[in-house]
Amino acid sequence: MRLQGRKIAILVESDFYEPEIYYYQHRFAEEGAEAHFLSRLWGQPSIEFKGHELRAPLRCDESFEGIGDENLGQFAAVIVPSGMVSDRLRYTDDVEKLPPATEFMRRVFARPDIVKGIICHGMWLLAPTPELVRGRRVVVHNNLFGDVKNMGGIYVDADVVVDGDLVTGRAGTVFHLFARKIIDMLAGDTA
Protein backbone atom coordinates (compact mmCIF):
# COMPACT_ATOMS: atom_id res chain seq x y z
CA MET A 1 0.00 0.00 0.00
CA ARG A 2 1.89 2.97 -1.35
CA LEU A 3 -0.23 5.70 0.24
CA GLN A 4 -0.68 4.30 3.74
CA GLY A 5 -2.01 6.98 6.09
CA ARG A 6 -2.35 9.69 3.43
CA LYS A 7 -5.57 11.67 3.02
CA ILE A 8 -7.09 12.68 -0.29
CA ALA A 9 -9.87 15.28 -0.40
CA ILE A 10 -12.48 15.03 -3.15
CA LEU A 11 -14.94 17.88 -3.59
CA VAL A 12 -18.50 16.72 -4.13
CA GLU A 13 -21.96 18.08 -4.90
CA SER A 14 -25.06 16.80 -6.68
CA ASP A 15 -24.74 15.61 -10.26
CA PHE A 16 -21.42 13.89 -9.60
CA TYR A 17 -20.34 11.17 -12.04
CA GLU A 18 -20.96 7.98 -10.04
CA PRO A 19 -18.38 5.67 -11.67
CA GLU A 20 -15.65 8.24 -11.04
CA ILE A 21 -16.53 8.89 -7.39
CA TYR A 22 -16.94 5.19 -6.56
CA TYR A 23 -13.64 4.43 -8.25
CA TYR A 24 -11.86 6.99 -6.07
CA GLN A 25 -13.47 5.55 -2.93
CA HIS A 26 -12.13 2.09 -3.67
CA ARG A 27 -8.90 2.75 -5.57
CA PHE A 28 -7.41 5.18 -3.06
CA ALA A 29 -8.34 2.79 -0.22
CA GLU A 30 -6.52 -0.03 -2.05
CA GLU A 31 -3.37 2.07 -1.79
CA GLY A 32 -3.96 2.76 1.92
CA ALA A 33 -5.22 6.33 1.53
CA GLU A 34 -8.34 7.78 3.11
CA ALA A 35 -10.78 9.45 0.73
CA HIS A 36 -12.50 12.44 2.32
CA PHE A 37 -15.51 13.90 0.52
CA LEU A 38 -15.79 17.63 1.16
CA SER A 39 -18.53 20.07 0.24
CA ARG A 40 -20.38 23.16 1.33
CA LEU A 41 -22.84 21.92 3.96
CA TRP A 42 -24.88 25.13 4.31
CA GLY A 43 -24.95 24.84 8.12
CA GLN A 44 -26.21 21.25 8.06
CA PRO A 45 -24.36 18.36 9.77
CA SER A 46 -24.50 16.42 6.49
CA ILE A 47 -26.06 16.50 3.05
CA GLU A 48 -27.02 13.65 0.76
CA PHE A 49 -26.05 14.41 -2.82
CA LYS A 50 -27.39 12.57 -5.87
CA GLY A 51 -25.33 11.33 -8.78
CA HIS A 52 -25.89 12.44 -12.35
CA GLU A 53 -26.53 9.18 -14.19
CA LEU A 54 -28.15 6.84 -11.65
CA ARG A 55 -29.24 9.44 -9.06
CA ALA A 56 -27.27 7.31 -6.58
CA PRO A 57 -26.88 8.88 -3.13
CA LEU A 58 -23.63 10.00 -1.52
CA ARG A 59 -23.72 11.37 2.02
CA CYS A 60 -21.20 14.08 2.82
CA ASP A 61 -20.49 15.23 6.37
CA GLU A 62 -17.23 17.14 5.91
CA SER A 63 -17.06 20.78 4.87
CA PHE A 64 -14.11 22.53 3.25
CA GLU A 65 -15.37 25.78 4.80
CA GLY A 66 -14.13 24.84 8.26
CA ILE A 67 -10.64 23.81 7.19
CA GLY A 68 -8.15 26.47 8.22
CA ASP A 69 -4.72 26.93 6.69
CA GLU A 70 -3.16 25.07 9.63
CA ASN A 71 -5.22 21.94 8.81
CA LEU A 72 -5.00 22.14 5.03
CA GLY A 73 -1.74 20.19 5.05
CA GLN A 74 -3.50 17.06 6.30
CA PHE A 75 -4.41 16.40 2.66
CA ALA A 76 -1.82 14.99 0.28
CA ALA A 77 -4.10 15.78 -2.67
CA VAL A 78 -7.31 17.66 -3.41
CA ILE A 79 -9.44 16.60 -6.38
CA VAL A 80 -12.11 18.56 -8.23
CA PRO A 81 -14.07 15.83 -10.05
CA SER A 82 -16.00 15.85 -13.30
CA GLY A 83 -19.74 16.24 -13.75
CA MET A 84 -21.57 19.32 -12.53
CA VAL A 85 -19.85 19.36 -9.12
CA SER A 86 -17.73 22.42 -9.87
CA ASP A 87 -20.62 24.34 -11.41
CA ARG A 88 -22.74 23.80 -8.31
CA LEU A 89 -19.86 24.60 -5.95
CA ARG A 90 -19.05 27.89 -7.64
CA TYR A 91 -22.36 29.39 -6.54
CA THR A 92 -22.03 32.39 -4.22
CA ASP A 93 -24.64 34.69 -2.69
CA ASP A 94 -22.35 37.70 -3.09
CA VAL A 95 -21.00 37.89 -6.64
CA GLU A 96 -18.31 40.33 -5.46
CA LYS A 97 -16.73 37.56 -3.36
CA LEU A 98 -15.10 34.32 -4.42
CA PRO A 99 -17.32 31.28 -3.99
CA PRO A 100 -16.23 29.39 -0.84
CA ALA A 101 -15.09 26.37 -2.89
CA THR A 102 -13.01 28.58 -5.19
CA GLU A 103 -11.49 30.31 -2.16
CA PHE A 104 -10.66 26.87 -0.74
CA MET A 105 -8.92 25.91 -4.00
CA ARG A 106 -7.04 29.22 -4.03
CA ARG A 107 -5.61 28.27 -0.63
CA VAL A 108 -4.83 24.75 -1.87
CA PHE A 109 -2.95 26.18 -4.87
CA ALA A 110 -0.82 28.23 -2.47
CA ARG A 111 0.51 24.93 -1.06
CA PRO A 112 3.02 23.27 -3.43
CA ASP A 113 3.13 20.23 -1.12
CA ILE A 114 -0.49 19.38 -2.01
CA VAL A 115 -1.20 17.68 -5.35
CA LYS A 116 -4.11 19.35 -7.14
CA GLY A 117 -6.27 17.19 -9.41
CA ILE A 118 -8.84 18.72 -11.76
CA ILE A 119 -10.67 16.61 -14.30
CA CYS A 120 -13.10 17.44 -17.10
CA HIS A 121 -15.52 20.25 -16.14
CA GLY A 122 -13.81 20.65 -12.76
CA MET A 123 -11.84 23.56 -14.21
CA TRP A 124 -15.02 25.67 -13.99
CA LEU A 125 -14.34 26.06 -10.28
CA LEU A 126 -11.17 28.03 -11.04
CA ALA A 127 -12.78 30.40 -13.58
CA PRO A 128 -12.92 33.26 -11.01
CA THR A 129 -9.19 32.79 -10.28
CA PRO A 130 -7.51 32.57 -13.71
CA GLU A 131 -4.12 33.37 -12.18
CA LEU A 132 -4.07 29.82 -10.78
CA VAL A 133 -4.05 28.36 -14.31
CA ARG A 134 -2.28 31.09 -16.29
CA GLY A 135 0.83 29.74 -17.99
CA ARG A 136 0.23 26.16 -16.83
CA ARG A 137 -0.09 23.13 -19.09
CA VAL A 138 -3.58 21.62 -18.72
CA VAL A 139 -6.19 19.50 -20.44
CA VAL A 140 -9.95 19.85 -19.99
CA HIS A 141 -13.11 18.63 -21.65
CA ASN A 142 -13.40 20.01 -25.19
CA ASN A 143 -16.33 22.18 -24.04
CA LEU A 144 -13.96 24.10 -21.75
CA PHE A 145 -11.20 24.74 -24.31
CA GLY A 146 -12.23 28.40 -24.66
CA ASP A 147 -12.42 28.82 -20.89
CA VAL A 148 -8.86 27.57 -20.46
CA LYS A 149 -7.61 29.86 -23.23
CA ASN A 150 -9.36 32.82 -21.55
CA MET A 151 -7.76 31.84 -18.23
CA GLY A 152 -4.33 31.88 -19.86
CA GLY A 153 -3.78 28.14 -19.57
CA ILE A 154 -1.73 26.21 -22.12
CA TYR A 155 -3.99 23.52 -23.57
CA VAL A 156 -2.34 20.14 -24.19
CA ASP A 157 -4.17 17.50 -26.25
CA ALA A 158 -3.74 14.45 -23.99
CA ASP A 159 -5.89 12.38 -21.64
CA VAL A 160 -3.90 13.38 -18.54
CA VAL A 161 -1.45 16.28 -18.17
CA VAL A 162 0.94 16.99 -15.29
CA ASP A 163 2.36 20.45 -14.67
CA GLY A 164 4.29 20.43 -11.40
CA ASP A 165 1.79 19.86 -8.59
CA LEU A 166 -1.24 20.08 -10.93
CA VAL A 167 -2.77 17.02 -12.61
CA THR A 168 -5.57 17.58 -15.12
CA GLY A 169 -7.74 15.07 -16.97
CA ARG A 170 -9.67 15.47 -20.21
CA ALA A 171 -12.98 13.82 -19.31
CA GLY A 172 -14.69 11.90 -16.56
CA THR A 173 -14.22 8.71 -18.57
CA VAL A 174 -10.44 8.78 -17.98
CA PHE A 175 -10.77 8.88 -14.19
CA HIS A 176 -8.73 5.68 -13.88
CA LEU A 177 -5.74 7.22 -15.72
CA PHE A 178 -6.15 10.45 -13.75
CA ALA A 179 -6.25 8.62 -10.39
CA ARG A 180 -3.27 6.46 -11.35
CA LYS A 181 -1.19 9.56 -12.08
CA ILE A 182 -2.13 11.12 -8.74
CA ILE A 183 -1.31 7.88 -6.89
CA ASP A 184 2.05 7.61 -8.66
CA MET A 185 2.90 11.23 -7.83
CA LEU A 186 2.00 10.80 -4.17
CA ALA A 187 4.00 7.57 -4.01
CA GLY A 188 7.02 9.34 -5.48
CA ASP A 189 6.93 7.43 -8.76
CA THR A 190 7.71 9.98 -11.45
CA ALA A 191 7.70 7.51 -14.34
Give, region by region, the residue ranges found by the protein language model.
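Extended, subdomain-level signal for the structured scaffold at the beginning of enzyme domains
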Residues: 1-113, 124-134, 145-191
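Short, thiol/selenol-centered motifs that function as redox-active sites or metal-ligating centers
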Residues: 118-122
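A short beta-strand/loop micro-motif in the catalytic core of glycosyltransferases
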Residues: 116-117, 138
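Substrate-gating cap/lid alpha-helix
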Residues: 140-143
